[in-house]
Amino acid sequence: MSVISMKQLLEAGVHFGHQTRRWNPKMKEYIFTERNGIYIIDLQKTVRMVEIAYNAVRQMAADGGKILFIGTKKQAQDAVREEAERCGMFYVNQRWLGGMLTNFETIKKRIARLNELEEIEGTEYWSKLTKKEQAQLLHEKEKLEKNLGGIKGMKSLPDMAFVIDPRRERIAVSELRKLGIPIVAIVDTNCDPDEIDYVIPGNDDAIRAVKLLTSKIADAVIEGRQGVDTSATVDEEEAEVAEETESMESAEDLDADLIEEEAE
């Protein structure tokens, strides 16, 4: 029994890694083979590691923990927002402000400002402002919403994080590790798995691959919080696994940031 099948992974292109010249040797154990200059990820390992990550996230959610979804690259933005909202968790999908976690007290002040701006819009006080003043406040609100909208309800640090492409999100990963917050991540062949607590070997560039794996993490949160099994469990026959394996073989700094934000 597994929470994800090799067929799902293959169809989403999870097995495609980066070019062989762009790799991290530490990912060698997760690589199945090489095809036309591209590394092919071992999906049998991905299946097992998705399940390990799923169980860890489910238990964290069952214990009342908060999971922060992080993915700012274009291919991940929609999936991160949609799946985090679906499971009622927080997310960062635009820009990671340096110190977002390690200087969280300052971030909370910016979140409070965002909430304040949302509350005054449309009030009597708002109607007394000039058009120019209203425009300035709306511009300020839009910028805060863009960067902090996904965490404006987050009153304290998260208990766990799910990261898409830890190499790109290296500042976030550094802050998470400094704070001792466990990390679950989609780790492609050019990433360092040693920085991640729960590695999910997989393609972090394809939209379908990112969506599939992110949705499984969201399912784990929902199951943990509600006690409802939302996972699409699969009981695969050995012949099916062999067939899919064959298919796989043939497949081809906060202050500076805030100052910059205000200056824009």
Curated annotation (Swiss-Prot):
GO terms for cellular component: cytosolic small ribosomal subunit. GO terms for molecular function: structural constituent of ribosome. Residues 228-264 are annotated as: Disordered. Keywords: Ribonucleoprotein, Ribosomal protein. It holds the Pfam family Ribosomal_S2. Residues 234-264 have a biased composition (Acidic residues). One of its GO terms (biological process) is translation. NCBIfam families: rpsB_bact (TIGR01011). HAMAP family: Ribosomal_uS2_B. Belongs to the universal ribosomal protein uS2 family. This is Small ribosomal subunit protein uS2. It comes from Symbiobacterium thermophilum (strain DSM 24528 / JCM 14929 / IAM 14863 / T). The gene is rpsB.
